[in-house]
Amino acid sequence: MQLKIQLLMLVLMIVLTDVYSKDGFIVSKKNCLYRCSQSDERGFCNAVCLRYDADSGYCRTGKCWCDGLPQKANIAMKNKNYC
């Protein structure tokens, strides 16, 4: 019984974490995208994304992409211009 409860709690945590997080190009407080180099291999972007409480980050199409951001994080919208 104890194992079933622990397993249920684990599944709920995974589901809720996925529901309450989002992915995207992070936007700074100055409304700018973080630019990066494809050769960066997680260094710069991962550090930027972690500052915004994301799970991880990497360079994607010359901009920092973050995985697992909190819902309050500001991410880029498709038809909007950023500095």
From Swiss-Prot:
Disulfide bonds join C32-C83, C36-C59, C45-C64, C49-C66. Its main location: secreted. GO terms for molecular function: sodium channel inhibitor activity; toxin activity. CDD domains: neurotoxins_LC_scorpion. It comes from the Eukaryota. It is found in: Secreted. One of its GO terms (biological process) is defense response. Residues 1-21 form the signal peptide. Expressed by the venom gland. Keywords: Disulfide bond, Ion channel impairing toxin, Neurotoxin, Secreted, Signal, Toxin, Voltage-gated sodium channel impairing toxin. GO terms for cellular component: extracellular region. Residues 22-83 form the LCN-type CS-alpha/beta domain. Binds voltage-independently at site-3 of voltage-gated sodium channels (Nav) and inhibits the inactivation of the activated channels, thereby blocking neuronal transmission. Has the structural arrangement of an alpha-helix connected to antiparallel beta-sheets by disulfide bonds (CS-alpha/beta). Belongs to the long (4 C-C) scorpion toxin superfamily. Sodium channel inhibitor family. Alpha subfamily. This is Neurotoxin LmNaTx3. It comes from Lychas mucronatus.
